């Protein structure tokens, strides 16, 4: 378990900033304590400094995970967010998409969101902007990337993709053996 290098921090923060923008500072400086990001086996963990000090006594090869896994670095040094980060990203999300009840199951099975399943979308969402996907009951379901801007969504075909799927809470069941 080690701190992230400057390059790793930059890549990770750029990815997280796509979803929460300048609210990124609120993740690190929280009122309930100071939190930090640590790298272990190519996975980035979000952990309080208090727990980090307690874990210092455990050797790195015996440590499975610590805190919440935010994502992992691929072999090409790109950062991929995991669904386990959703609970921390959703409250600070700048751009949100609400999907109709009929489209929820399709999204939870890993499919993209179609215009026919779109309930609402945050105003001024640009194309390829990171969005958090909610049910109509304001329950965070996952996150994705807007395939169309808010203005384009109004005049697009009902079978056109409006949100590209990135991660959803159905992954807890589909990939339970690999999530840490």
Swiss-Prot record:
GO terms for cellular component: cytosol; nucleolus; nucleoplasm; preribosome, large subunit precursor. It comes from the Eukaryota. The keyword Nucleus applies. The keyword Transport does not apply. Pfam families: pre-PUA_NIP7, UPF0113. Residues 93-180 are annotated as: C-terminal domain. Coiled coil: none annotated. Keywords: Nucleus, Ribosome biogenesis, RNA-binding. Residues 94-170 form the PUA domain. It is found in: Nucleus, Nucleolus. GO terms for molecular function: RNA binding. Residues 1-92 are annotated as: N-terminal domain. Expressed in muscle, heart, liver, fat, kidney and lung. Weakly expressed in small intestine, ovary and spleen. Its main location: nucleus. CDD domains: Nip7_N_euk, PUA_Nip7-like. Gene3D superfamilies: 3.10.450.220, PUA domain (2.30.130.10). Required for proper 34S pre-rRNA processing and 60S ribosome subunit assembly. Belongs to the NIP7 family. This is 60S ribosome subunit biogenesis protein NIP7 homolog. It comes from Sus scrofa (Pig). The gene is NIP7.
């Amino acid at each position: 378990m080690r701190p992230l290098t400057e390059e790793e921090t930059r890549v990770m923060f750029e990815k997280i900033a796509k979803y929460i923008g300048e609210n990124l500072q609120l993740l690190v400086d929280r009122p309930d304590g100071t939190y930090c990001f640590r790298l272990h086996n190519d996975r980035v963990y979000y952990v309080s400094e208090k727990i980090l000090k307690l874990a210092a006594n455990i050797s790195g090869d015996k440590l499975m995970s610590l805190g919440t896994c935010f994502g992992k670095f691929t072999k090409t040094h790109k950062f991929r967010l995991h669904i386990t980060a959703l609970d921390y990203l959703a409250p600070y999300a700048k751009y949100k998409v609400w999907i109709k009840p009929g489209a929820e199951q399709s999204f939870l099975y890993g499919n993209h969101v179609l215009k026919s399943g779109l309930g609402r979308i945050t105003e001024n969402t640009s194309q390829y902007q990171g969005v958090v996907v909610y049910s109509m009951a304001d329950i965070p379901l996952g996150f994705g990337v807007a395939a169309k801007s808010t203005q384009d969504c109004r005049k697009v075909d009902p079978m056109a993709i409006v949100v590209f799927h990135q991660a959803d809470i159905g992954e807890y069941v589909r990939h339970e053996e690999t999530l840490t």
